[in-house]
Each structure stands twice: as C-alpha cells, then as structure tokens.
Swiss-Prot record:
Family the UniProt entry places it in: Belongs to the DDA1 family.
Region named Disordered: 67-102
Keyword annotations: Ubl conjugation pathway
Stretches of the chain forming a coiled coil according to its record: none
One annotated Gene Ontology cellular component of this protein: Cul4-RING E3 ubiquitin ligase complex
Its biological purpose: Functions as a component of numerous distinct DCX (DDB1-CUL4-X-box) E3 ubiquitin-protein ligase complexes which mediate the ubiquitination and subsequent proteasomal degradation of target proteins. In the DCX complexes, acts as a scaffolding subunit required to stabilize the complex.
Pathways per UniProt: Protein modification; protein ubiquitination
InterPro entries: DDA1-like, DDA1_dom
Protein name (record): DET1- and DDB1-associated protein 1
Subunit (UniProt): Component of numerous DCX (DDB1-CUL4-X-box) E3 ubiquitin-protein ligase complexes which consist of a core of DDB1, cullin-4 (CUL4A or CUL4B), DDA1 and RBX1.
Domain of life assignment: Eukaryota
GO BP annotation list: positive regulation of proteasomal ubiquitin-dependent protein catabolic process; protein polyubiquitination
Length: 102
C-alpha cells in the first residue's frame, strides 16, 4: 500500500487505516437496483410539456382558487337579492327632462 500512496501531497497511514482492498471488490459484485414498472404504457404515448412557466401556472391556479369562492359568494348574493330587494340600477327619470331643455 505504500507504493500506492507514493507521490501524493500528504502521506499519513492513519488516514487510510480503515481502507481494505477486499471490501471494494465485494461492493462491485452487487447487482444494481433496477426500476420495474407496474403498468404497461402504450409506446405511441406522446409526452407534451406545457409552454407556461411553472411559477406562473401555480400563481394562476392559486388566484383561481381564491377568486372562485368570492365569485360563488357574489353569485349567491345576487340570486338572493333578486328575490327580495329591488335591482341596484334604476332607470333615470330625469333624462327626458334634460333632453327637452337643450
């Protein structure tokens, strides 16, 4: 092992005291782990990536979720309002008077 360490910038046997050449060979005999799919996918399947930025897509989704509740509440108020209260906008009655003056 001294020949192996010759020429290195630092030579200290205690740095390599736990090194065993036999352990390296045993590790290389192990078979690598392999992914085995559980489902068959058609070979014609086309993977398409979205053009929009991931961050922008996320922000749009969050905005839609946030505003969906507000929109639902607004629609509910409008439905209830139609049944009990008069409409918010009322036709102007003085518009004819203004036209007659000119």
């Amino acid at each position: 092992m001294a020949d192996f360490l010759k020429g290195l910038p630092v030579y200290n046997k205690s740095n390599f005291s736990r090194f065993h050449a036999d352990s390296v060979c045993k590790a290389s005999n192990r078979r690598p782990s392999v992914y085995l799919p559980t489902r068959e996918y058609p070979s014609e399947q086309i993977i398409v990536t979205e053009k929009t930025n991931i961050l922008l897509r996320y922000l749009h989704q969050q905005w839609d979720k946030k505003n969906a509740a507000k929109k639902r509440d607004q629609e509910q108020v409008e439905i209830e309002g139609e049944n009990s209260a008069p409409p918010r906008k009322i036709a102007r009655t003085d518009s004819q008077d203004m036209n007659e003056d000119t």
